[in-house]
Amino acid sequence: MFDNFNIEKYKQISFPKDNSLRTLGEIKRLKLMPLNKVLPFKYDDIGNVFQNIFSHRAESFPYRVVQKLIEESEPVIKKIKNYHNRPRPNVNAKKFKIDLDYLKMKSAQTPAFPSGHSAQSKLVALALTDIYPHLKREFDKAAENISNSRI
């Protein structure tokens, strides 16, 4: 599905250097945020989040379509992550001698950028909107919740 996906434009995305004042500012802002220990786990399983939208509806959840999108987009996202090799905030915080609380999650073991959960949830939301356009608002909200749970 994504065999010929061109990642070149994603290589052009820039972010502050790991040891920059801007990165320090980002870490300090994260330090001020309370650590939410519920949302990251609630929204960790992307397929399940979208499947829940269908739990009270007559429409059937296209499980295979969603799983295929998630599985086949993973190598592309990992390729972009490995290209940028952006450390997770807790790793950068240590470089500034800042103790940053974070949740150790199995799904958070790759470089931080881009967020795989954000990318995949948006991809799933777009695909499901093509199938069920009348549920667009709910799909977009689910993708937004998934993205925000990764902060």
Pin down the residues of each PLM region.
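Secretory-pathway/luminal and periplasmic proteins that interact with or process carbohydrate-rich
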Residues: 75, 89, 149-151
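Solvent-exposed, acidic/flexible segments
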Residues: 66-69, 73, 117-121
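Polar/charged alpha-helical tracts
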Residues: 8-9, 52, 71, 101, ...
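Membrane-embedded catalytic cores of phosphoryl/pyrophosphoryl-handling enzymes
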Residues: 93-151
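N-terminal transmembrane-helix/juxtamembrane module of multi-pass inner/ER membrane proteins
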Residues: 1-70, 77-94
